[in-house]
């Protein structure tokens, strides 16, 4: 495997692949987002890592984005393109699936993000 040039990375995504998130489709969502990252030409600037449980099972599958300190919820394969287009390509934080931002006093309790499907 080739060595990754860490100096090119702008965003590091952590994909929860703990038991509950896996049961909710985390593996498929992870694979699809990784595919879209490469397809969009972002493979050098976006690094991805699978993790175990991040402690927000009811909101899963979870993605954490660094260095922004953003947590995203309910990340299914069906939301992958929306996430990549809005967040990684356009640089917009999709509020409907944002769970938390470091430093905020509370979790974003907006309605379920199911409306983002498809």
Q: What do these predicted regions represent?
A:
Residues 10-26, 49-65:
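Local cysteine-cluster metal-coordination motifs and their immediate loop/turn environment
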Residues 24, 28-32, 36:
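Compact Cys/His-rich
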Residues 1-12, 24, 38-46, 67-69, ...:
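Iron-sulfur (Fe-S) cluster-binding modules
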């Amino acid at each position: 495997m080739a060595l990754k040039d860490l100096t090119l990375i702008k965003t590091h995504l952590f994909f929860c692949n703990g038991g509950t998130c896996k049961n909710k489709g985390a593996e498929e969502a992870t694979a699809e987002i990784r595919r879209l990252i490469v397809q969009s030409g972002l493979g050098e600037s976006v690094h991805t890592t699978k993790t175990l449980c991040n402690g927000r099972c009811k909101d899963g599958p979870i993605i954490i984005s660094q260095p922004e300190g953003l947590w995203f919820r309910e990340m299914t394969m069906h939301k992958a393109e929306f996430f990549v287009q809005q967040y990684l390509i356009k640089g917009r934080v999709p509020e409907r699936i944002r769970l938390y931002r470091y430093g905020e006093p509370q979790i974003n309790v907006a309605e379920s993000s199911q409306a983002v499907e498809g």
